[in-house]
């Protein structure tokens, strides 16, 4: 079993145990989630309130119980995730991929930062010098960044990987 983080619980919603969910919309397709420190919980209800998702979990029946879960990480089992359409990827699948600029490996994806308007790849460089091994931030934006078989290809960005 392999778990991947899909989000965190935000503030409670109303009085009957609802929690705002901050994270991947993939939660809409799940029947259960793994809650940090609390184990597996069935999703009993899930709905939108404006732009937010609200989740009701089995055993979380009032606001006091919901408050105990605020800020906790929420995970899903990889096998429970729905398949994605061609050209789309789960972010966890990008972690560890090599990054190439003009056919030369310049680093490896170590994390992905949710920066609001667009997500950002955190790439740890490869090389002999300390500067070569520094982390660099690259917006995850097509057509400048392409996920292809064998790695991620980034168009040259002057000064970033020189």
From Swiss-Prot:
Its main location: cytoplasm. SUPFAM superfamilies: PRC-barrel domain, Translation proteins. GO terms for cellular component: cytoplasm; ribosome. Residues 86-160 form the PRC barrel domain. Keywords: Chaperone, Cytoplasm, Ribosome biogenesis, rRNA processing. Gene3D superfamilies: PRC-barrel domain (2.30.30.240), RimM (2.40.30.60). Belongs to the RimM family. This is Ribosome maturation factor RimM.
């Amino acid at each position: 079993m392999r778990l991947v983080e899909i989000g965190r619980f935000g503030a409670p919603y109303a009085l009957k145990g609802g929690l705002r969910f901050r994270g991947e919309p993939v939660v809409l397709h799940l029947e259960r989630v793994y809650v940090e420190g609390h184990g597996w919980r069935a999703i009993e209800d899930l709905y939108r309130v404006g732009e937010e998702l609200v989740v009701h979990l089995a055993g979380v029946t009032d606001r006091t119980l919901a408050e105990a879960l605020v800020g906790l990480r929420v995970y899903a089992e990889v096998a429970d995730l729905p398949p994605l359409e061609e050209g789309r990827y789960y972010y966890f699948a990008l972690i560890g991929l090599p990054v190439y600029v003009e056919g030369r490996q310049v680093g490896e994806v170590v994390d992905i930062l949710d920066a609001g308007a667009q997500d950002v790849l955190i790439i740890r460089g490869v090389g002999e010098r300390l500067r070569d091994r520094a982390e660099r931030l690259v917006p995850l934006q097509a057509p400048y960044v392409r996920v292809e078989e064998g790695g991620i290809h980034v168009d040259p960005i002057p000064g970033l990987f020189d």
